[in-house]
């Protein structure tokens, strides 16, 4: 569906969000969005509205209910206000390519913010399911990419029920009313907005499902007072930030995994599966990451920082771990108790993999041991993993 198929929800008011072309233009090797008319309508789950601090995933609408018929206008200047309401919009998303495979120099957009604004925005997004798994670097990039959108007047429609969505919004100032029409789309006339179901105030957010795919909005959100302020993030920027950081991290993990003796013969595909399953954990200085005597359950890659291994009865550390080192790999083979403790010397970030996750992805470890002939290695095991008893 072309961008011209969407009518601005702002009507006679000036549109502070820019033209569709401006909003959708992103540098980099981004493929066009392909949308199709579908034989069956796309439904959406019921939405629970709360006030104040209301958040709702405005990403889907009830396409089974047909809106008023649409037709092309007689004049060539634009489409009628109801043109898009009768159309069923498929769920789609842009095809993006990592920078390592495309020779562009894309960098995340950055819009300066005060310390107070950053704190409010961070609190607004940290409880949202789309942002809960982000690491510090990704969160900083997301916060930097949010762009300010002043809403100067009352009754300006920010999103319109039934329209395709591509922006997520955080409210910094003002109030916004939420309306839902039972037909699934906003209708013409004074009653076309539907029922008022909630109010979004400062610190609230809406439209998060637009960051995942291009689906019809499930509600209309409009300013309830003048001089409101929103911060907006578009889907392409969000997905690009996540894709680039995830791609870089996976490549780093795969390089680390190549250095692990019992995993050295994994294929590239197997390493990529393991890399995707690694879970990032952070520990402040002085934290016991692994305790001597505990059963060996997890294998760790050290992303950054330093950690030390200690054994009971020995005052000095038996080993120092730095970025790129690994420990606890024999936990993938058995559940024997740890023979040493690992304590973070500085703040550390590790990537952890449990034995159960490893077996779920690649099956039993024994075939891999046969591949590497790890059973035959009897000497030097303590040097490779001082956490495992001899």
UniProtKB/Swiss-Prot annotation:
Binding site residues for 3',5'-cyclic AMP 2: 262-383
Taxonomy, superkingdom: Eukaryota
GO molecular function ontology, one term from the record: cAMP-dependent protein kinase inhibitor activity
Biased composition (Polar residues): 1-17
PROSITE patterns: CNMP_BINDING_1, CNMP_BINDING_2, CNMP_BINDING_3
Region (Dimerization and phosphorylation): 1-129
Record-listed 3',5'-cyclic AMP 1 binding positions: 130-261
Modification sites for Phosphoserine: 90
A UniProt-annotated Pfam family: cNMP_binding
GO cellular component annotations of the record: cAMP-dependent protein kinase complex; cytosol; nucleus
Keywords, ordered alphabetically: cAMP, cAMP-binding, Nucleotide-binding, Phosphoprotein, Repeat
Region Disordered, residue ranges: 1-81
Subunit structure: Tetramer, composed of 2 regulatory (R) and 2 catalytic (C) subunits. In the presence of cAMP it dissociates into 2 active monomeric C subunits and an R dimer.
PANTHER family from the UniProt entry: CAMP-DEPENDENT PROTEIN KINASE REGULATORY CHAIN, CAMP-DEPENDENT PROTEIN KINASE TYPE I REGULATORY SUBUNIT-RELATED
The family this protein is said to belong to: Belongs to the cAMP-dependent kinase regulatory chain family.
Record protein name field: cAMP-dependent protein kinase regulatory subunit
Source organism: Pyricularia oryzae (strain 70-15 / ATCC MYA-4617 / FGSC 8958) (Rice blast fungus)
Gene transcribed to yield this protein: SUM1
